[in-house]
Amino acid sequence: MDRSLRNVLVVSFGFLLLFTAYGGLQSLQSSLYSEEGLGVTALSTLYGGMLLSSMFLPPLLIERLGCKGTIILSMCGYVAFSVGNFFASWYTLIPTSILLGLGAAPLWSAQCTYLTITGNTHAEKAGKRGKDMVNQYFGIFFLIFQSSGVWGNLISSLVFGQTPSQETLPEEQLTSCGASDCLMATTTTNSTQRPSQQLVYTLLGIYTGSGVLAVLMIAAFLQPIRDVQRESEGEKKSVPFWSTLLSTFKLYRDKRLCLLILLPLYSGLQQGFLSSEYTRSYVTCTLGIQFVGYVMICFSATDALCSVLYGKVSQYTGRAVLYVLGAVTHVSCMIALLLWRPRADHLAVFFVFSGLWGVADAVWQTQNNALYGVLFEKSKEAAFANYRLWEALGFVIAFGYSMFLCVHVKLYILLGVLSLTMVAYGLVECVESKNPIRPHAPGQVNQAEDEEIQTKM
């Protein structure tokens, strides 16, 4: 097997194991720990920590530890969060959420940097276009990574499926579910029936073990990215400490980045809505917590399949077509969620919505990462740090207002932000089409590759 592909697969399966645990836990936080909003507060704190770390940690850690060391260290924060759930309280979930958040931005920045460099290096050796290899590697990664939601949620559904069956709720009590849920209602719903603590411990044990395996896999099998860079480009020059620290903010001199900040912001908002509002106000409220995993499996499976599909299709259609597809799909889902009144006998509809949400989310995950990697190829660490910063802010906002706004208000907010996002993205495409060739920065790649980066992606 090609060495580059092997490294991509190691990263992908390491993230698969790690997010099998974290993805399952995130989907259940708002339902398991609904008392006084502990679950959503923990998630909001988590992404607040990620927002802060995005400002300075990723470039520093990647420069000092390399991509592999950064990934390993950051993964340990995720394992700590799983352990913290064994003793869920304000004194355990909040500190471990902060720890996870501080490691999340470096983790994703290191992953994106690793795949981008690996793709460009392999493309140079194989005589292929760098952007195509980067897109392909991101497609492979997200195919494997997004399936983590399938396994994580399948585990939770099988474990919680041992909970005694819940009675069907009266019609009048279902009126507080869905878009009408304002979280102030005192009506009893299926969300009040929590699984036994023994089942919760069983689930957490499985998740913690999965996270530990992820750390061991990366440590044992992933080739350090600096070794790859030395082989293809020679020894890397030393970067001053403060230059690395400020690189995240210096990138805002590029007007394209200023226009693109809404893309990761919306990505965080829509993911936060699905994992918090949809799972709690629609699924748990109407069907019960044991159905959360099954519904999220549909989302994850669709997301995974579309991720690899988009990685292949984008080289023929261009990214703009995929962005329009994602926007239209999400707008349709939001309007339907505003109008729909969920009932237990609408079982298939719960899966349709989660599946369509995955179709659109795959666009944001694959194309956003590839777009940042291509447009800011010479400032990858800082660009991806900025991406995670704004995505984290989206999560913080989504979880932060979760306990204070009605679901229908949150849907209107999503619609508004998505509209602004597409306008800003369209402006970036206009800028790119009018400036097919840009001046070379010191140390930039050859002109042919630069032209491809600016005109094709």
Swiss-Prot record:
It is found in: Cell membrane. GO terms for cellular component: membrane; plasma membrane. Although UNC93A gene is located in a region of the genome frequently associated with ovarian cancer, no evidence have been found for a tumor suppressor function. Keywords: Cell membrane, Glycoprotein, Membrane, Transmembrane, Transmembrane helix. Expressed in testis, small intestine, spleen, prostate and ovary. Pfam families: UNC-93. PANTHER family: PROTEIN UNC-93 HOMOLOG A, UNC-93 RELATED. Glycans are attached at N190. SUPFAM superfamilies: MFS general substrate transporter (SSF103473). It is a multi-pass membrane protein. This is Protein unc-93 homolog A. InterPro entries: Ion_channel_UNC-93, MFS_trans_sf, UNC-93_regulatory. Belongs to the unc-93 family. The chain crosses the membrane at residues 8-28, 42-62, 65-85, 86-106, 140-160, 202-222, 257-277, 291-311, 320-340, 344-364, 395-415. It comes from the Eukaryota.
